[in-house]
């Protein structure tokens, strides 16, 4: 399997509880390297652009409000099959359905406050990474 990069967000429910280190430990334990990372307060415009795919969904406004409610940590992860590997480490969106040992099983508060986001495909990973990082900010 090829080395890939994927995009990750540690969401406001994770930063407010100061569990970003615990989440990073799970990421690294899975064999993924954090090659870029920064803590930001996402603007409304950034959140609306990032989640534009959900614009017509009834939860869009609530999602944007949540993602701008506090700091987030945006990351670029790298490793063999990084996209699938990180999705496995995150676990199901619904923490009650997530496998034991996954980030969401261990740390998510609810379906809405599920602690993390990860890219779902190489194309979306490239777009998401470019939204938050310049090339020289990614150091592999």
Swiss-Prot record:
Q: Where is the active site?
A: 117
Which GO annotations describe the biological process of this protein? CTP biosynthetic process; GTP biosynthetic process; UTP biosynthetic process
What does this protein need as cofactor? Mg(2+)
Root EC class:
transferase
Q: Does the keyword Lyase apply?
A: no
Asked whether the keyword Cell division is assigned, the reply is: no
Q: Where in the cell is it found?
A: Cytoplasm
A Pfam family matched in the record: NDK
What molecular function does GO assign, one term?
ATP binding
EC number(s) stated in the UniProt entry for this protein: 2.7.4.6
Please provide the record's keywords in A-Z order. Answer: ATP-binding, Cytoplasm, Kinase, Magnesium, Metal-binding, Nucleotide metabolism, Nucleotide-binding, Phosphoprotein, Transferase
User: What reaction(s) does this enzyme catalyze?
Assistant: a 2'-deoxyribonucleoside 5'-diphosphate + ATP = a 2'-deoxyribonucleoside 5'-triphosphate + ADP; a ribonucleoside 5'-diphosphate + ATP = a ribonucleoside 5'-triphosphate + ADP
CDD domains xref list? NDPk_I
Which residues hold ATP? 11, 59, 87, 93, 104, 114
Function statement: Major role in the synthesis of nucleoside triphosphates other than ATP. The ATP gamma phosphate is transferred to the NDP beta phosphate via a ping-pong mechanism, using a phosphorylated active-site intermediate.
Q: Summarize the subunit comment.
A: Homotetramer.
The family classification in the record reads: Belongs to the NDK family.
Protein name stated in the entry:
Nucleoside diphosphate kinase
Q: What is the lineage of its organism?
A: Bacteria, Pseudomonadati, Pseudomonadota, Alphaproteobacteria, Hyphomicrobiales
């Amino acid at each position: 399997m090829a080395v890939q990069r994927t995009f990750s967000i540690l969401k406001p429910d994770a930063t407010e509880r100061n569990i970003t280190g615990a989440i990073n430990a799970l990421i690294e334990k899975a064999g993924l390297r954090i090659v870029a990372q920064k803590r930001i307060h996402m603007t409304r415009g950034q959140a609306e652009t990032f989640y534009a795919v959900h614009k017509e969904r009834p939860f869009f406004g609530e999602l944007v409000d949540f993602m701008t409610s506090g700091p987030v940590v945006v990351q670029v992860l790298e490793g063999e099959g990084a996209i699938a590997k990180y999705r496995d480490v995150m676990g199901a969106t619904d923490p009650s359905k997530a496998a034991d040992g996954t980030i969401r099983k261990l740390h998510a508060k609810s379906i809405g406050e599920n602690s993390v986001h990860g890219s779902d495909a190489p194309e979306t990973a490239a777009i998401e990474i470019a939204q938050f990082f310049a090339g020289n900010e990614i150091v592999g």
